[in-house]
Swiss-Prot record:
UniProt name for this protein: Phosphoheptose isomerase
Keyword Transmembrane helix appears in the UniProt entry: no
Keywords, sorted A to Z: Carbohydrate metabolism, Cytoplasm, Isomerase, Metal-binding, Zinc
Locations listed in the record: Cytoplasm
Record note on cofactor: Binds 1 zinc ion per subunit.
Enzyme Commission number(s): 5.3.1.28
Other known facts: The reaction produces a racemic mixture of D-glycero-alpha-D-manno-heptose 7-phosphate and D-glycero-beta-D-manno-heptose 7-phosphate.
Gene: gmhA
Matches recorded under CDD domains: SIS_GmhA (cd05006)
Binding site for substrate: 52-54, 65, 93-94, 119-121, 124, 172
Pfam families associated with the record: SIS_2
One MF term in the entry's GO annotations: zinc ion binding
Family: Belongs to the SIS family. GmhA subfamily.
Amino acid sequence: MYLDQIKAELVEAQDLLNKFISDENNIKLIQEAALLISNSFKQGGKVLSCGNGGSHCDAMHFAEELTGRYRENRPGYPAIAISDASHLSCVSNDFGYEYVFSRYVEAVGQKGDVLFGLSTSGNSKNILNAIEAAKTKGMKVIAMTGKDGGKMAGLADVEIRIPHFRYADRIQEIHIKVIHILMMLIEFEMAKQA
């Protein structure tokens, strides 16, 4: 009944992953992001992650694997997904949803920390504001985007961009793969210090 559609979905996902892998710069950017985060941890810094919708779930997933575990039993790493419901509702109500992440960065972020922002369009105003707040605080910024990078193109210290222009879910599929690779590399790098 749906076998052709199922296969087409899997082939499209495979094609996008192959396209992403074929650009050697993407591989280098993933390594750069992992080292940036690891170096922050080694210097006493932390990661603040944020996103909207499915990207919000990915931001939480990343923070959970940093504080909890990925593949290895090891100490937890300092990470916070900006997801506290009372903070989000307070700032949305009092200031506007475009400030929900930047207010948190202003309150909690410190020089040497890393902001990890996800936006499939690269145009999320609340992530753009968080990037601006992070830079003001002396934080490093990693942006995971899609399409042409949107307004976030060129703003981050490291931008990992998925060049897909159709559906956000395809971009998110690569984002979660990259997050898992980052976790693996961070665990490798932090184990050197242990």
